[in-house]
């Protein structure tokens, strides 16, 4: 009988209907990935030797010149920035003085500023912002041209297709890459949540990005504390010199042999996955859920595409005919048995994302939504519930 560690600790398990959010554990690893990690844990190896083989295999799987495993996408942004600064000076990052680092510049679109860019800010390089986070005065190529100078070490770009939560106003990735190429400036793309589709693992770098960073613990379904960097061999020579297990910046971002092997196993499965079958399953479950509530005057189920992260994967919202009820619905979902975790879509709707769910979990969510509908009806009739 397997050990129930969460029960021992008194931590309640949840059905994750929100998606691959870090705050709820990202995604679930497959048994194959778990077995690979356990196998890696049973023996010891020389980390650099394992790292080289894993990175080589990941580069091949993702059709890139090079790859590197980090302990998360945010760590990948920091390592990428440090590597670009080191490349700019032609010296290892730990050998640079604070004054040299502070003189180097990294360009960001104002429309792309977000809490994740702390990975860039903590480098202590100068952040140069361009454009505005709206379409009143859209950013043009000249804005980027004027921002580039002899101190520019890199351009960071937050990639999200239309429909996601990123503000409008930035240059397209294509135009950004074109300007950067004219000046020989590396472009680092933050695409942490941008699989699916699997093709993004090679299309973004194929378009010209020097480094592209993905989360390993989101839809790739690798270890939660893992990230995947892919890109061009020339810049990755600096990443290898900067990242773990090198002393300096890289030492802060340790990656265990279990995470390296686990992420490799996850990527092997992901690129071989039948994405069309998975998409059809999600569409069928959404259609089935909508049918369950066709006769309800209180709840309607709506299909959303793409999802709020801009991913080309369908999800649904449960909308209640009760203004301002979303927080109460979230509370009732969390307090139910089983506990269900999700997020509000607006003041009277909540998300249910099939991406992280199994059939039996969707069934349980539908049952609980009907129970909440009953609770609201009883309250509306003044009954003590």
Give the residues covered by each predicted segment.
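Glycine-rich phosphate/diphosphate-binding loops and the adjacent beta-loop-alpha structural elements
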Residues: 269-275, 350, 355
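Conserved C-terminal alpha-helix-loop-beta "cap" of PLP-dependent enzymes
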Residues: 5, 294-368
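Conserved PLP-dependent catalytic core of the aminotransferase class-I/II
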Residues: 61, 271-305
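A glycine-/small-polar-enriched, mobile loop at the entrance of the PLP active site in fold-type I
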Residues: 15-53
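Alpha-helical metal-binding/catalytic segments enriched in His/Glu/Asp
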Residues: 37, 216, 352
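Conserved PLP-enzyme active-site core in the AAT-like
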Residues: 2-24, 28, 55-271, 290-294, ...
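Alpha-helix C-capping/helix-to-loop hinge sites
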Residues: 40-43, 246, 270-273, 336
